[in-house]
Amino acid sequence: MDSYKQYIKQALPNLSIHSYKQNEEGWDNIAVIINDDLLFRFPRKQEYAKRIPLEKKLCTLLSHSLQEIEVPKYHLLYKKDTDTIPLCSYYTLIHGEPLQKEIVTTLEKKELKAIITQLATFLAALHNIPLKQVTTLGFPIEKTITYWKELQTKLNQYLTNMFTSLQKSALHHLFENFFACIATSTFQNTIIHADFTHHHILFNKQNKSISGIIDFGDAQIGDPAFDFAGLYYDFGREFTTSVYEQYSTIISHHDPLLIHRITSFYQYSPLLHNIIYNFETKNALKFIADTEQLKAILQGRD
């Protein structure tokens, strides 16, 4: 803890530190909040650090087309002036709390409608950024068929002793149907947030609206439907469909099968990724709980 505090003091000598909070829950970064005003993100690995300048460029682009929703305004800090990879980034804290399901269920109809509009507007603004522009910036295409096949292989390996042959077969069909769907799809790739879950959607309790979207560290070029996966997983079908219906009226390209890709596969993506993460980080309790959830889903799909 002291090493981060020490570094911040050295990098910003004029900053008086009155309060210091450290959050190590993130998969990619350790977050440090200073004076309830500045949020510093220290990447856990070099590969995450390399993404920070891209994240900054994307947020700058997005800020031009967003009125109500804030995105981080990044400042980058380097260990040495000659370095090209930042040691960390920081931005003025966007106040709000993660949009939990409990918050959504307590909203009045009018408030809920306003939030749905905000989310649809944000996703459309992101997905409408010209592909040529983000390709030039250097955003990668990551969630290819190869990526999903590797994910499938890992799941088969990690779950082999916990699944019956019927469950293994159901998991196989889930993936094979998705691969067949992608093979016949003609959707257009866009820039995607790729980690659009309640953790990264900030809600302002006072005015009952979305105050900001954060953590663009996984941003990449990919299937726009993937950005609805977290919404579906966190808030369910009705909410996600409402966001999609508004989104489809403002998005620049027509994609009639987008909702099908969400309901048939992407809605399970957060759970599948959690299973792998919890196995690899040896979190047995969460791994078992997630595996039981997947078993119930596969049984329901038979």
Task: Tell where the protein language model's regions lie, with residue ranges.
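Active-site acidic catalytic loop and adjacent metal/ATP-binding pocket
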Residues: N29-I33, F40, H173-F226
